[in-house]
Regions:
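Contiguous hydrophobic, helix-prone segments at protein termini
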Residues: 1-268
Length: 268
């Protein structure tokens, strides 16, 4: 038996095939992006069209209020930080470490020295995937970085939240007021509908847009933040390979080349 088993082709083929697969995954990821976004827009346009026909002169603001208050994935990273901050305040010695001005690495080292700190770090690590795959910017550019590879960012937010909690402030996002205004607006307009047929049309369009409207923001987290963070990291692995072989100076230098040029470099 020969190990590793011969494949009949060079390992360089796997390398180029893997890069091509990454490119195709980006195309596929953005197909999902527009699938989510365009379906949301379609549902909103249909609901807006029904509303304008039933309520001539209705404002765009009123239509917007009737679909507001969707719970979206983009809120989740902030919620995880809030939960971690409350947990820190409830643990002995944890809040004091998190409020210090030292970098994240120093705080982690200090937390690992105490039992409650270790327990808090376990909760932090559990929250990281997928919710800390959040870009430090728009998510569109490789140089923006992400929470997952720059822990000073989430630790900085947690420091602020802990301080606010100790001052008696509320740190969680509240949709209660928005949801109340939404439900009241829908109820008021629904009272104006005279026929069962029109009411059925309104309810159908409204239920549809309320069901899928969250995707207007969900695509933002899952594609432009989570997916892009992973994709950029995979491209950097190719950059590291090129550095090791003397082709470029730094892993991020690979981003200077387009998707047609990189296979040529890999071939070399």
């Amino acid at each position: 038996q020969v190990l590793p088993a011969p494949k009949g082709y060079y390992g360089s083929y796997d390398l180029i095939e893997s890069f091509d697969k990454l490119v195709h995954q980006m195309f596929k990821g953005w197909q999902y992006h527009f699938e989510m976004l365009n379906l949301t827009y379609l549902a909103y346009l249909m609901f807006g069209d029904v509303s304008r026909k039933l309520f001539p002169g209705i404002s765009e603001s009123a239509i917007g209020k009737m679909v507001a208050g969707a719970y979206v994935s983009m809120f989740r990273p902030e919620e995880e930080l809030c939960q971690l901050s409350r947990l820190a305040v409830s643990f002995r010695g944890v809040a004091e470490i998190l409020k210090s001005d030292q970098p994240a690495a120093g705080k982690i080292a200090e937390l690992e020295k105490i039992p409650d700190g270790k327990q808090w770090l376990e909760a932090f690590d559990k929250a990281k995937d997928p919710w800390f795959f959040v870009s430090c910017g728009s998510g569109w550019f490789h140089y923006e970085g992400s929470w997952i590879n720059n822990l000073d960012i989430p630790y900085g937010y947690i420091k602020s939240y802990v301080e606010r909690l100790e001052n008696g402030e509320t740190i969680e996002r509240s949709l209660d007021k928005v949801e109340k205004e939404r439900d009241e607006t829908v109820a008021e307009y629904r009272k104006l509908i005279e026929s069962d047929e029109d009411r059925e049309a309104f309810d159908g369009a409204y239920n549809t847009v309320r069901t899928i409207y969250r995707y207007a923001e969900d695509h933002l987290f899952w594609v432009e933040h989570w997916f892009h963070t992973i994709w950029f990291a995979k491209i950097r692995e190719f950059g590291t390979l090129l550095v090791d072989n003397g082709m470029i100076n730094e892993p991020d230098d690979i981003f200077m080349f387009n998707r047609y040029e990189i296979p040529e470099i890999l071939t070399e």
